[in-house]
Amino acid sequence: LEKMDDAEFAEKFQNISVYARVQPEHKTRIVNAWRNAGYVTAMTGDGVNDAPSIKAADIGIGMGITGTDVTKNVADMVLADDNFATIVGAVEEGRRIYDNIRKAIQFLLGSNMSEVLSIFFATILQPVHLLWINLVTDCFPALALGTEKAEPNIMKRKPRDAKAGIFADGMGFDIAYQGLLVTALVMVSYFIGHFMETGEWTITNSAHGTTMAFVTMSMAEIFHSMNMRSQRGSIFKLGSKNRLLFGAAAVSLLATTAVCEIPLLAGAFGFTSVEPAEYLVALLLSVLVIPIVELVKWIQRRSTR
């Protein structure tokens, strides 16, 4: 290493697997070479001589039992049990947390997009309706998505590009088409509700149509939160269950039903009582969000093979 200049070392370092008797400055040089090549680096160590390279790495890992105080202070991660296998568990947990953040963001932005479009294309819902959906219908499922367990293939994925943004890997497209999908279902529900009330297919203000649109949007977003348990995988093949998400969905559904059926709340929101047949139509429309998104996921998986 002493005899190699930087240019020569840059050509050869990727072919070297084992180093012996390296000095602290050599360790830092090795770490920097990998970082300059665009790789995410991790460095473990326990002694004072490891501190410079641990600090230089993207992820500095110190030993909690045998490590010196200097090493622990500069490390990003401290292994409390000095077990290297713990690093794998930490990487898995980090990927799970990042995945869940993306799922919650995608769910909330897709839902908000459908709400905005429902006003942009036609004034189907009023601001107070959208405020209720944002604060009650969307809030609880989004929080529950943050507790989702790691997906089965999470450790088989390639390392994520450190420069990739939160909307990478087609997330922007997913938000757009899912928002448009819910908007389309809500608009269809509005016109069906108006037709069931008047027997006419006309574009006009309709209390029944507005109520059905509200119920459909609320239930569609509740069902869509189930889609977000996995951004690409089928939710029917997940090996785990998110009981908190199911509970949050049930609470949101009960709140939506209450605001439509309790006279005091229904009057404040301008809703009318919904008949069982109308509830059934809203349910059938809103549940379509699951098979349609599953179909798109399947196409996306096929296209990336």
Regions inferred by a protein language model and the residue ranges of each:
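Membrane-embedded transport module
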Residues: 1-43, 57, 62-232
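C-terminal transmembrane module of polytopic membrane proteins
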Residues: 146, 215-305
